[in-house]
Amino acid sequence: MTGYVANIEKLSIENENFRAVLYTDKNVQLVVMSLLPGEEIGMEVHHLDQFIRVESGEGKAILDGVEHAIGDGVAIVVPQGTNHNIINTSSEKMLKLYTLYCPPNHKDGTVHKTKADAEADEAEHFDGVMSE
């Protein structure tokens, strides 16, 4: 296989995991995420660039202290070094999104069912192994 082709909207909406890595190459990684009602990713900063697109739900993105309302179809670009957080503000509906890390941030094939699983996995950062 060369590259990755899939209906990312469908995969994002169907995903029930906090995080699932779908594809990893040396310069880019595709990940789907789902946040439970009221859940947040948590304030973080990366030494890489990140693109996020919301497929379903509502929430807010905080980039270097500035809050932005987000929902279906909203795109977020997070330049390296930016403190950021994504928060699901709904009390009923999951926030479904996908993200591109440039370069990769997680081990290829990583799946975290819950945020607690992700926080407990100390060895899940990108190790140089790609999807193909």
List PLM regions with ranges.
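A short, N-terminal "cap"/entry segment at the start of jelly-roll beta-barrel domains
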Residues: 1-27, 113-132
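Conserved short histidine dyad/triad with adjacent acidic residue
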Residues: 15-16, 31-46
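A generic "binding-loop/recognition-motif" signal
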Residues: 28, 37, 47, 66, ...
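Helix-adjacent hinge/juxtasegments
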Residues: 43, 62-64, 68-69
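Glycine- and acidic-residue-biased ligand/ion/polar-headgroup-sensing regions
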Residues: 49-59, 64
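Ligand-binding loop in jelly-roll beta-barrel domains
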Residues: 60, 80-107
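Short acidic-glycine-tyrosine-enriched beta hairpin
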Residues: 66-80
